Every structure is written in structure tokens, then in C-alpha cells.
């Protein structure tokens, strides 16, 4: 079988939206190539992140990012590519900057694809105690290190996007043993898995997307946390009946605004709401909405162009 590599040249801001477009077109996973990752890792003072092969620096664009996906060649591939191009251009109507927004196509042999794509994925230390490891990698954790295994070939990626990293680090800082947690827009389920690994008693992982629900369910089983994590298909927080100690949402800023009042009502007094997926220039908009809902902002963290906002419902 022949495969085609679809490569989209876009911006950091549009990575998640472009990735979703590629998933909807039939891709089972995406590869993100961002030269700023090299720059960030070379200047970090902590030991978080992946070990990078500097020889690959010249393969990355000087500006913007490349989002790559692989589609099986078929008679309707031309129409599929036209649909991808159209949907990417439509993102500008939602206020996203897409940069070049170009789509290129390269043919790849199945044998080459079956082996070469795994080279992009290595263990990544996300926080003090959590490391994301591709399921095929042999990895021996340190005594205080917990492992999240993911299949990067599945939909919703690797769990190492800056917004995910910010969320996981905030969960590690604010989660208390035996807390109940809600993960809104769970995607791969990585935040729900992280909460379970860090001591949550019960975790409810919600997503409207059927593919996300399947992906999260598989990842929860892979990480052996099915007793703690319940994955449900649902519209934002409408499935919830009882308040919890911690709500997390790695989701677009505009979507956070839709349920921030519900988040306040479903956060126990003294509990926290962690919101990420927020591009820097939309930070104040989300902060203002959280405060208007009744939350107190306790911390804002930043990684690359993204921020996470941690808010508290006062006791």
C-alpha cells in the first residue's frame, strides 16, 4: 500500500485546530515539527522535555511549524486534500492565524512509514514526577517517577504539547490525594491519566467527540487506571451532577468561556479550576471571565506562546 504524507505549514496557534482537521480527514496521528522546540530545550534550566537530535535542526522551517499526517492513497485523495485546504483557510474566520497555511503532499512507501514514523517519539519528562513514554519504548523510571504510556499513532497525539504540559504541571501542584477530578474535553485522556497517577480518587473524562472517547478509553486501559477513570461522551459539563475538588480543561479559550459559570458551580469551595489551551493574547479574556464567574485567580503559567490559568473557588 502507498501512503501520502500531508504537510501543513502553519503557526503554533493553529496546531491543535490543524491537527483536528487532519484527524477528521482520516489521519490516525500527527507529527509536529517546530524549530522553537529546539531553541526552548537548549535554554532550559530544568531537566524537563525530550533529548533532541541537533542534526535534524535543518529539516525544520525557519518560521512557523509543520504539522504532518499520513493518509492511505485512494481514488478520492485529491478531494480529501482540497477539503483539508478549504478547512484550514476557514480557520481564519474563527480568529486563528494560520501563517502560510500551505498544504503539500509526498508519497511514502508503507514499509518506510511502518518503521520511520516512530523515530519522532521518545520519552518526554513532563513534570517532576511524570514522564510520557511511547508504548513501544523500554523505559526504566526513577523511584519517584511515574509513567504515562501513550500510542502516538492514535488520534489526539502524544500528550506533550505545551498546553498539555502546563496542565499536567498544574495538576501535580494543586491535586490533593483522593480528590475527585473532571477533565473537560479529554482528547487522548492524558490529563485524566495524569490525575489518576498522581493520586486522584475518581476522575471523570468527558469529550463530545466519539473518536476522542475511544482514544481516551484505550489509553486509560493501557495505563491500568480504569478503576479510577471513567470516560464519557458528553457536551462539556452537562453530564455532571455533583461538585468536585478539581476541574481541568485543555481546550480553546472560546470554549472555556462557554462553561466557565458551570465550572464554578461544579467546583467545591476550596477547589480549583485549571484552564489551558489559551494562546497568550487571549489570556485576559479568560481571566476576566473566570473572575466574573466568582473564581479567584491564584496563578498563571506560560510555556512558549501558551498559558494556563489556575483559579480557586474560595471556601
Curated annotation (Swiss-Prot):
<feature type="binding site">
    <location>
        <position position="250"/>
    </location>
    <ligand>
        <name>S-adenosyl-L-methionine</name>
    </ligand>
</feature>
<comment type="function">
    <text>Methylates ribosomal protein L11.</text>
</comment>
<keyword id="KW-0808">Transferase</keyword>
<dbReference type="Pfam" id="PF06325">
    <property type="entry name" value="PrmA"/>
</dbReference>
<dbReference type="InterPro" id="IPR050078">
    <property type="entry name" value="Ribosomal_L11_MeTrfase_PrmA"/>
</dbReference>
<feature type="binding site">
    <location>
        <position position="164"/>
    </location>
    <ligand>
        <name>S-adenosyl-L-methionine</name>
    </ligand>
</feature>
<dbReference type="GO" id="GO:0005737">
    <property type="term" value="C:cytoplasm"/>
</dbReference>
<keyword id="KW-0489">Methyltransferase</keyword>
<keyword id="KW-0949">S-adenosyl-L-methionine</keyword>
<dbReference type="GO" id="GO:0016279">
    <property type="term" value="F:protein-lysine N-methyltransferase activity"/>
</dbReference>
<feature type="binding site">
    <location>
        <position position="185"/>
    </location>
    <ligand>
        <name>S-adenosyl-L-methionine</name>
    </ligand>
</feature>
<dbReference type="InterPro" id="IPR004498">
    <property type="entry name" value="Ribosomal_PrmA_MeTrfase"/>
</dbReference>
<feature type="binding site">
    <location>
        <position position="207"/>
    </location>
    <ligand>
        <name>S-adenosyl-L-methionine</name>
    </ligand>
</feature>
<dbReference type="GO" id="GO:0032259">
    <property type="term" value="P:methylation"/>
</dbReference>
<keyword id="KW-0963">Cytoplasm</keyword>
<protein>
    <recommendedName>
        <fullName>Ribosomal protein L11 methyltransferase</fullName>
        <ecNumber>2.1.1.-</ecNumber>
    </recommendedName>
</protein>
<comment type="similarity">
    <text>Belongs to the methyltransferase superfamily. PrmA family.</text>
</comment>
<dbReference type="InterPro" id="IPR029063">
    <property type="entry name" value="SAM-dependent_MTases_sf"/>
</dbReference>
Amino acid at each position: 500500500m502507498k501512503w501520502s504524507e500531508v504537510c501543513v505549514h502553519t503557526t503554533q496557534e493553529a496546531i491543535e485546530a490543524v491537527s483536528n482537521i487532519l484527524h477528521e480527514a482520516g489521519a490516525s496521528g500527527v507529527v509536529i515539527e517546530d524549530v522553537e522546540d529546539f531553541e526552548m530545550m537548549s535554554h532550559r534550566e530544568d531537566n524537563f522535555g525530550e533529548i533532541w537530535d541537533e542534526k535534524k535542526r535543518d529539516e525544520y522551517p525557519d518560521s512557523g511549524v509543520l504539522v504532518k499526517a499520513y493518509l492511505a492513497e485512494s481514488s478520492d485523495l485529491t478531494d480529501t486534500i482540497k477539503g483539508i485546504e478549504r478547512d484550514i483557510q476557514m480557520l481564519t474566520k474563527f480568529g486563528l492565524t494560520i501563517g502560510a497555511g500551505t498544504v503539500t503532499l509526498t508519497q511514502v512507501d508503507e514499509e518506510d512509514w511502518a518503521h520511520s514514523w516512530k523515530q519522532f517519539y521518545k520519552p518526554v519528562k513532563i513534570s517532576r514526577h511524570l514522564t510520557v513514554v511511547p508504548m513501544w519504548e523500554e523505559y526504566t523510571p526513577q523511584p519517584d517517577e511515574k509513567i504515562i504510556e501513550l500510542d502516538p499513532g492514535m488520534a489526539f497525539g502524544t500528550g506533550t504539547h505545551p498546553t498539555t504540559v502546563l496542565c499536567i504541571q498544574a495538576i501535580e501542584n494543586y491535586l490533593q490525594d483522593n480528590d475527585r477530578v473532571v477533565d473537560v474535553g479529554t482528547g487522548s485522556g492524558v490529563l485524566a491519566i495524569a490525575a489518576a497517577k498522581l493520586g486522584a480518587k475518581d476522575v471523570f473524562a468527558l469529550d463530545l467527540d466519539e473518536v476522542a472517547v475511544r482514544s481516551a478509553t484505550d489509553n486509560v486501559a493501557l495505563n491500568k487506571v480504569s478503576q479510577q477513570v471513567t470516560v464519557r461522551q458528553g457536551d462539556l459539563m452537562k453530564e455532571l451532577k455533583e461538585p468536585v475538588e478539581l476541574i481541568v480543561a485543555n481546550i480553546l479559550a472560546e470554549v472555556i468561556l462557554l462553561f466557565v459559570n458551570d465550572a464554578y458551580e461544579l467546583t467545591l469551595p476550596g477547589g480549583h479550576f485549571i484552564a489551558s489551551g489559551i494562546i497568550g493574547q487571549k489570556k485576559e479574556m479568560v481571566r476576566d471571565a473566570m473572575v466574573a464567574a466568582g473564581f479567584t485567580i491564584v496563578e498563571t503559567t506560560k510555556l512558549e506562546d501558551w498559558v494556563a490559568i489556575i483559579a480557586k473557588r474560595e471556601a
